[in-house]
Amino acid sequence: MSIVVTGASGLFGRATVAGLLERMPAGEIIAMTRQPAKLADMAAKGVDVRQGDFDDPDSLERAFAGAQKMLLISASLVGKRIPQHRNAIEAAAAAGVEHVIYTSYVGRGDDQNASLAVSDHRGTEKLLRESGRRWTVLRNTQYTEAVIEAQAPHALRTGRWIACAGDGRMAQVTREDCVACAIAVLTTPGHEDVVYNITGPELMSFRDIAAVISEIAERPIEYVVVDDEGMYAFFDSLGIPRDASKEEVVNGIPWSSDDMVSVERAIRLGQMEILTDHVQQLTGRRPQSLRALAWARRDELRIAG
């Protein structure tokens, strides 16, 4: 059985390929990337590295040829994802891929959800259901790493955690746990036409998170609630673009204020308050908590700023 992983030179894709190498022959792994040179180390291990671009449908069909399963790692740009994912799903069908596993995003309400990202992901899920392929959807929640790497440092420097999410809650999950779930679905039977919500072990507000980061970093942080316009002003002050099609990458994490403000609005409205045991179901282990990851990275947090 051959498995193709899209976006294989990114953080999620590279970790997935590394995990697959521990479970199956390298020659059965196809790693797709726009820039094959970035995966020279994987090619040296025998992985079949292929060039492919979501904006070039012909390249996708070539990249997917011979694969039975595909991990479709979602593209990053809000508003551009759906046409890019349509290209990938249509190419998978043309190449004879039997089962597509997709990294989506949690959220209640689907069309009524305030998050722009949720709208994009539900659009892709609809394409999958209509594709004639077997499918599995992994609705990942916010990465814990995004909180620790992209949000906490500014709060530690300034002593203020600014948010428009109010006291709404979300169950952040580590990228490592998300990758482990993807690998489990790719390498074990029984996941066809199923939606999994991949969450951490605990629902937390940003107020809760600020308190944890403050405690572990041993530095005071005030939680400051603003309205949506106040949140836009905060992101403007950081130089982050508003337009979600021009996201700024910070520590490997794409940011745009349209995207982030809409997510925090959805959190405030309770639309992201989802907690499951799907990580444990798929991997046999409990997901890592935000506190545990923050403690493991406490030295970084204590020197932040």
Give the positions of each predicted feature:
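Rossmann-fold cofactor-recognition segment
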Residues: 43-56
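A hydrophobic C-terminal alpha-helical subdomain
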Residues: 229-305
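Oxidoreductase cofactor-interface core, primarily capturing Rossmann-like NAD(P)-dependent enzymes
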Residues: 1-38, 55-58, 63-65, 76-83, ...
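Redox-cofactor binding/interface segments in oxidoreductases and associated redox assembly factors
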Residues: 69-73, 102
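A short hydrophobic/small-residue beta-strand
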Residues: 49, 99-100
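Residues lining the SAM
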Residues: 6, 73, 284
